[in-house]
């Protein structure tokens, strides 16, 4: 099988592991920078070119598309899909997951428990927005933020109003969310492949912070998850139509709450913490689904 990995940096841990796992299972692998792909959109002879050459057909494509290049990265992935390549996460699912507002609306519609959340662009009544989510303490986020950037814990009403007013000055979309105190700065990252949680870790915020992102200096340990947490993680990934997803869960007194569904979860922290070969599980999923029938169905 011929597999393309779409990534701006082939030296990243996740890309290297996926490449190694695919090669170990006998596949040919090429890492392509999606921003260097250019496309001929033609009903008779569509194609993808890369650095001066027309690319051959790939049986499957693994998208490792960063948030900053979502628009063009998913456009390039769509072209591969149109040419019959099986995507490990479809372009439409990635775009959907990157839209935090749409994601939360879809999850809520499916009855998946979330922290109480309010979203606004430039709220005229900051006080009402705060009341809507139950008052302080609360978390204020920029909708476009990633890896804990643009996330502030406002412990008092006055602090919340000040942060919201400051974010409003950025002309940005603002997300206001109840603070789950009992989580104590921890969350659970469940790595879903297909209909299975293949690994789970607990991420704990560093001292003096409440954000558990490993990129922000948080620590990780192996997590033992409950059947309810396993079920909600799989349901969240399925709701977003993702074959592979990192589902972040908070343990609240009222039960597990989904914080986020990540369409391009990093493998380094979770593989090194659990010792589980997740990359090979992803390649095996591709082997089962990147079939000749799929290629013919999609026009490749």
Curated annotation (Swiss-Prot):
Top-rank taxon: Bacteria
Keyword match Ligase: yes
GO biological process: protein modification process; SOS response; translation
Residues that hold Mn(2+) 1 according to the record: 248, 260
Transmembrane intervals: none
Binding positions for Mn(2+) 2 per the UniProt entry: 260, 262
Cofactor requirements of the protein: Mg(2+); Mn(2+)
UniProt binding sites for Mg(2+) 2: 260, 262
Cellular component GO terms held in the UniProt record: cytoplasm
Cofactor binding, note field: Binds 2 magnesium or manganese ions per subunit.
Positions with a binding annotation for ATP: 141, 178-179, 187, 211-213
EC number: 6.3.2.-
Binding residue positions for Mg(2+) 1: 248, 260
Single GO MF descriptor: metal ion binding
SUPFAM superfamilies reported for this sequence: Glutathione synthetase ATP-binding domain-like
Key words, A-Z: ATP-binding, Ligase, Magnesium, Manganese, Metal-binding, Nucleotide-binding, Protein biosynthesis
Matching InterPro entries: ATP-grasp, ATP-grasp_RimK-type, ATP_grasp_subdomain_1, RimK, Rimk_N, Rp_bS6_RimK/Lys_biosynth_LsyX
Enzyme class: ligase
Residue intervals of the ATP-grasp domain: 104-287
NCBIfam families named in the record: PRK10446.1, rimK_fam
Function: An L-glutamate ligase that catalyzes the ATP-dependent post-translational addition of glutamate residues to the C-terminus of ribosomal protein bS6 (RpsF). Is also able to catalyze the synthesis of poly-alpha-glutamate in vitro, via ATP hydrolysis from unprotected glutamate as substrate. The number of glutamate residues added to either RpsF or to poly-alpha-glutamate changes with pH.
Family indicated by similarity: Belongs to the RimK family.
Name of the protein: Ribosomal protein bS6--L-glutamate ligase
Organism: Escherichia coli O6:H1 (strain CFT073 / ATCC 700928 / UPEC)
Designated gene of the protein: rimK
